[in-house]
Amino acid sequence: MLEPLLKHLHISSILRFKDYLPPPNIMADVRNVIIIGAGPAGYTAGLYTARAMLEPLMFAGYASGGQLMLTSDIENFPGYPEGIAGPEMMVDLRKQAERFGLEVEDKNVEKVDFSSRPFKVTVEGEEHLANAIIISTGADSIWLGAEGEEEQKGKGISTCATCDGFFFKDKTVAVV
């Protein structure tokens, strides 16, 4: 499984990489990479690790896409000059990564054990082993609970200064 990849690496890289591999008797059950989270970072990791022939497995969770699934217009992502709806962009990212071999399971990770190699990822009571774990679980907004906040989301109340700051250029704003 790794031999085609290893033959192109410098010998010092191979020796360092092999130090982290589990014993040969359990190699068949060990993934090279498990990705936890299915937003833009997760799918980018999936795309690149799949193209590197590392046979990645992604656990996307039951609500993959994160905050972008609630975003109607994304205008600051390269490749979409007219903007794109968040859910549509997530479909595009998933399709592209899967085209190169990313395996996606829409399941939630319950636990990760980093105490020894290979690492253990528990999903719905089942243990998965991997040499590397990429955690790309994203972020979540913290709301104040202020009066009128819910009604004004997306109409002047924003949770992403770098995303929405452009819309408030030359205006008076409050940042909490």
Question: Where are these predicted regions, by residue range?
Answer:
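N-terminal Rossmann-like dinucleotide/flavin-binding domain of flavoprotein oxidoreductases
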Residues: M69-E127
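N-terminal Rossmann-like FAD-binding beta1-loop-alpha1 element of flavoenzymes
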Residues: R31-L57
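Short beta-strand "acidic-cap" motif of Rossmann-like dinucleotide-binding folds
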Residues: E55-G61, L68
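Rossmann-like NAD(P)H-binding beta-loop-alpha module
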Residues: L47-R51, G61, K169-V176
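N-terminal amphipathic/hydrophobic targeting modules at extreme N-termini
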Residues: M1-L2, L6-H8, S12-L15
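Short amphipathic alpha-helical segments
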Residues: G46-L47, L70, G145-G148
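FAD-binding core/adjacent interface of flavoenzyme oxidoreductases
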Residues: S13-R16, L21-I36, A52, V104-K171
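Conserved Rossmann-like nucleotide-cofactor binding loop
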Residues: A41, A63-S64, D140
